[in-house]
């Protein structure tokens, strides 16, 4: 779409905001159109989500719900992005690569579970970690060696970099990518629970990307100046549109689950956005719901191994609330509210620095 301006001699399609808008609606329409067809196909192929044997009783009725919906909304976002971005932008190409690679990892994991009808038959934890590290390196190393990405570490509400991580930045960035990817994966346990917080996180990071990529805005707001970063906003918009199309079918009661192909890709992409916008630490606030879910699992496993006692009735924490009697809809909406508030607070750091 950017290159249409060369043919028409109008600058309309050179604006990031215009192309982001087109990407959003293209992805939304694709997702809304393709998802019901995928649901029908998945039901015919019995490609449903295996339910964890110790899951709350209310989850037993979900055993026939199709999974791998992430493949559709990620594909929709990629197609929309490719139709709108500039192909000579290393940030945009790396971002798309991140989205695709982490989706493929999740897809392999999903297929293992679906084909064997066993929730433990996907990728082993060790293999999943290894593939995530490799995918992370493929996305990060070109940026590092091209000197396009600063290795300085920034903290929220402070305008100057804390210090330069130098070569250690690679290990730190891989940690951020993997942690974010798995955190969203852990959160995806209730209908729409991971979808809406992901939309909030993508929106917040998209704003940071746009401001840091604009030299005037970044200088005025004392944000890191990173030329070319704004192009990734188009991919953010496409993914938000695709997620909204997916949410139409994923809201309670869900007609389709995103599966690991969706959750791992979303988490990896959100982590990547935090890295290139220099918001690695602020990601703890931007993705607060994902952090909360992950910490609950760490506490549960650690407490059981050390003290042989459980902190929660079940982890991740959304299952704990199910066990104490909260209905699923109440948990979902309250977690959405927490995600919204945490992202608004993260946005406040733009001016308060």
From Swiss-Prot:
It catalyses: UDP-N-acetyl-alpha-D-muramoyl-L-alanyl-gamma-D-glutamyl-meso-2,6-diaminopimeloyl-D-alanyl-D-alanine + di-trans,octa-cis-undecaprenyl phosphate = di-trans,octa-cis-undecaprenyl diphospho-N-acetyl-alpha-D-muramoyl-L-alanyl-D-glutamyl-meso-2,6-diaminopimeloyl-D-alanyl-D-alanine + UMP. Pathway: Cell wall biogenesis; peptidoglycan biosynthesis. The chain crosses the membrane at residues 22-42, 65-85, 88-108, 129-149, 161-181, 192-212, 228-248, 256-276, 281-301, 330-350. Keywords: Cell cycle, Cell division, Cell inner membrane, Cell membrane, Cell shape, Cell wall biogenesis/degradation, Magnesium, Membrane, Metal-binding, Peptidoglycan synthesis, Transferase, Transmembrane, Transmembrane helix. It is an enzyme of class 2 (transferase). Its main location: membrane. GO terms for cellular component: plasma membrane. It is found in: Cell inner membrane. Its cofactor is Mg(2+). GO terms for molecular function: metal ion binding; phospho-N-acetylmuramoyl-pentapeptide-transferase activity; UDP-N-acetylmuramoyl-L-alanyl-D-glutamyl-meso-2,6-diaminopimelyl-D-alanyl-D-alanine:undecaprenyl-phosphate transferase activity. One of its GO terms (biological process) is cell wall organization. It holds the Pfam family Glycos_transf_4. Its EC number is 2.7.8.13. It comes from the Bacteria. It is a multi-pass membrane protein. Catalyzes the initial step of the lipid cycle reactions in the biosynthesis of the cell wall peptidoglycan: transfers peptidoglycan precursor phospho-MurNAc-pentapeptide from UDP-MurNAc-pentapeptide onto the lipid carrier undecaprenyl phosphate, yielding undecaprenyl-pyrophosphoryl-MurNAc-pentapeptide, known as lipid I. Belongs to the glycosyltransferase 4 family. MraY subfamily. This is Phospho-N-acetylmuramoyl-pentapeptide-transferase.
């Amino acid at each position: 779409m950017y290159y249409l301006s060369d043919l028409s001699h109008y600058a309309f399609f050179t604006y990031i905001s215009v192309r982001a808008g087109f990407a959003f609606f293209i992805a939304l329409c694709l997702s809304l159109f393709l998802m019901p067809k995928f649901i029908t196909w998945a039901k015919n192929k019995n490609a449903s989500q295996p339910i964890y044997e110790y899951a709350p009783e209310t989850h037993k009725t979900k055993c026939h719900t199709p999974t791998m919906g992430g493949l559709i909304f990620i594909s929709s976002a990629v197609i929309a992005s490719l139709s709108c971005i500039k192909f000579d932008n290393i940030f945009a190409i790396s971002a798309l690569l991140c989205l695709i690679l982490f989706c493929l990892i999740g897809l392999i994991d999903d297929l293992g579970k679906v084909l064997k009808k066993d929730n433990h038959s996907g990728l082993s934890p060790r293999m999943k970690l290894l593939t995530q590290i490799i995918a992370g390196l493929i996305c990060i190393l070109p940026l590092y060696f091209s000197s396009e990405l600063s290795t300085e570490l920034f903290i929220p509400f402070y305008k100057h970099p804390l210090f330069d991580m130098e070569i250690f930045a690679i290990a730190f960035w891989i940690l951020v990518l993997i942690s974010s990817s798995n955190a969203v994966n852990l959160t995806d346990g209730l209908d729409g629970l991971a979808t809406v917080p992901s939309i909030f996180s993508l929106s917040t990071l998209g704003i940071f990307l746009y401001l840091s990529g604009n030299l005037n805005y970044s200088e005025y707001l004392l944000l890191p100046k990173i030329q070319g970063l704004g192009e990734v906003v188009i991919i953010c918009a496409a993914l938000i549109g695709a997620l909204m199309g997916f949410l139409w079918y994923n809201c309670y009661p869900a007609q389709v689950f995103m599966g690991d192909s969706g959750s791992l890709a979303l988490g990896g992409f959100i982590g990547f956005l935090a890295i290139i916008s220099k918001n690695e630490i602020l990601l703890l606030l931007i993705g607060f719901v994902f952090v909360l879910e992950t910490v609950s699992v760490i506490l549960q496993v650690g407490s059981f191994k050390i003290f042989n006692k459980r902190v929660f009735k079940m982890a991740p924490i959304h299952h704990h609330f199910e066990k104490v009697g909260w209905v699923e809809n109440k948990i979902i909406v309250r977690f959405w509210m927490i995600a919204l508030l945490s992202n608004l607070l993260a946005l406040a750091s733009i001016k308060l620095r």
